[in-house]
Swiss-Prot record:
This is (3R)-3-[(carboxymethyl)amino]fatty acid oxygenase/decarboxylase. It catalyses: a (3R)-3-[(carboxymethyl)amino]fatty acid + 2 2-oxoglutarate + 2 O2 = a (3R)-3-isocyanyl-fatty acid + 2 succinate + 3 CO2 + 2 H2O; a (3R)-3-[(carboxymethyl)amino]fatty acid + 2-oxoglutarate + O2 = a (3R)-3-{[carboxy(hydroxy)methyl]amino}fatty acid + succinate + CO2; a (3R)-3-{[carboxy(hydroxy)methyl]amino}fatty acid + 2-oxoglutarate + O2 = a (3R)-3-isocyanyl-fatty acid + succinate + 2 CO2 + 2 H2O. Fe(2+) binds at residues 97, 99, 260. Disruption phenotype: Disruption of this gene attenuates M.tuberculosis growth and survival in untreated mice. Its EC number is 1.14.11.78. Its cofactor is Fe(2+). One of its GO terms (molecular function) is dioxygenase activity. It comes from Mycobacterium tuberculosis (strain ATCC 25618 / H37Rv).
Length: 289
């Protein structure tokens, strides 16, 4: 199978993916396309759940989401997001985030399959954090070099149906055990491309410390957040890329370098998506101080 790429960079379109004949796609071929463009849309694929999983396994090691309530009923590898009652978990992703940023190792790839999309203007916003970092003047970059950031997902953890009537302290203790705050270098280096990435997120990154654990002025973090564009309520920052898609497309991106959030459209109706997240086996280094 020969994959054809139309366009360059964020939103490049890939054709030639036959869900019934995936064996000819090599891991290196599809990974290189993603590493190069960062965000690609595999057009008009319409895979079954099994075919979607098979493609994910070609790309990398699939890691199921840690909370079973998000799992597909027959395929736990698949994360289901849906506004249709009983078909998945609603209201996911309506804030800037990096998938699994709160886990011990940054995930390499995220891959989403839309099954139902209400209207033409529903989509996803993306920000290239490597491009942001490259654009910053030295005066903004220097205070972040060699520092460590704390990422805390706890305020976005959803209450599960099984948590109803449980003491809130008990639920909170479980959240702390399962998803405690985690520290990563403020600037990581992509293990494949070598690009430096400003690894921060407005909804998860709570503070920056120097290499000795001393707090860095909170204004440094605030200025970096503003520079990325994720604080722009109108989504007009030049760093924000808007990606639309259609049912049957597959949206695949480099999860180390791109942050994203849902773009809600003007039309009412059901939104249902499947998602896989994968590792690539490459260790993510921090900035070489």
């Amino acid at each position: 199978m020969t994959l054809k790429v139309k366009g360059e960079g964020l939103g490049a379109q890939v054709t030639g993916v036959d869900p019934k004949n995936l064996d000819d796609i090599t891991t290196d071929e599809i990974r290189d396309i993603v590493y190069t463009n960062k965000l690609v849309v595999l057009k008009d694929v319409h895979p079954s759940p099994r075919e979607f999983i098979k493609l994910g396994r070609i790309i990398g090691q699939i890691v199921p989401y840690y909370e079973p309530m998000y799992h597909h009923e027959d395929h736990p590898e698949i994360f289901v997001s849906s506004t249709e009652e009983g078909q998945g978990v609603p209201k996911t992703g309506a804030f800037w985030h990096i998938d699994y940023m709160f886990m011990p190792e940054p995930f390499a790839f995220s891959m989403v399959l839309p099954l139902a999309v209400p209207g033409h203007d529903r989509g996803t916003y993306f920000i290239d954090l490597a491009r942001v970092w490259q654009s910053l003047p030295a005066a903004k970059r220097d205070p972040a070099r060699g520092t460590v950031s704390t990422h805390d997902p706890r305020r976005h953890i959803k209450i599960r149906p099984s948590d109803v009537y449980r003491p809130i302290g008990e639920v909170w203790d479980e959240i702390n055990r399962t998803t405690p705050p985690i520290k990563w270098p403020t600037v990581i280096r992509h293990p494949k491309t070598g690009q430096e990435i400003l690894y921060i997120c407005a909804t998860g990154t709570t503070k920056i410390e120097d290499k000795d654990g001393n707090p860095v002025d909170p204004e440094v973090l605030q200025e970096l957040m503003a520079a990325t564009g994720q604080l722009d309520p109108e989504y007009q920052s030049p760093f924000i890329h808007t990606q639309h898609y259609q049912v049957g497309d597959i949206i695949l991106w480099d999860n180390r370098v791109l942050m994203h959030r849902a773009k809600h459209g003007s039309a009412a109706g059901t939104l249902t998506t499947y998602r896989l997240t994968m590792l690539d086996g490459l260790k993510t280094p921090g900035y070489a101080a």
